[in-house]
Amino acid sequence: SVIELGKMIIQLTNKTPASYVSYGCFCGGGDKGKPKDATDRCCFVHSCCYDTLPDCSPKTDQYKYKWENGEIICENSTSCKKRICECDKAVAICLRDNLNTYNKKYRIYPNFLCRGDPDKC
């Protein structure tokens, strides 16, 4: 769920999840146009990951994970929860690995500036 995703973002980036709300064209919704930078591309890939889970509820299904030796370990009983956790883990790692591309000018980015068809997943 968004709760666990938020915790992962804090643990891996030391940024508040609010830093990524309405960032670029893909973080926090929108999902149109082209990613503005590598940080926004992380969110694009995350959206694609969620698209592979049509029978799950990634924004509301709560799952369990461990934070062990600086690593996220997904531990869930159901396939949906495990896969949601893996999608969220991947985006949190991607955001951490691309912290150097984070640009404040893309925070609360106006959605109308996101034009064109998005890349294919």
From Swiss-Prot:
InterPro entries, per database record: PLipase_A2, PLipase_A2_Asp_AS, PLipase_A2_dom, PLipase_A2_dom_sf, PLipase_A2_His_AS
Localization (cell): Secreted
Keyword annotations from UniProtKB, A to Z: Disulfide bond, Myotoxin, Secreted, Toxin
Gene Ontology MF term list: calcium ion binding; calcium-dependent phospholipase A2 activity; phospholipid binding; toxin activity
Tissues expressing the protein: Expressed by the venom gland.
Keyword Secreted belongs to the record: yes
PROSITE patterns: PA2_ASP, PA2_HIS
Main location class: secreted
A single Gene Ontology CC term: extracellular region
Note from the entry: Negative results: does not show antimicrobial activity against E.coli and S.aureus and does not produce appreciable hemolysis on human erythrocytes.
Protein task: Snake venom phospholipase A2 homolog that lacks enzymatic activity. Shows high myotoxin activities and displays edema-inducing activities. Has cytotoxic activities against HUVEC cells (LC(50)=2.5 uL) and human lung adenocarcinoma A549 cells (LC(50)=2.9 uL).
The protein's name in its UniProt record: Phospholipase A2 homolog EPL_00195
Protein source organism: Echis pyramidum leakeyi (Leakey's carpet viper)
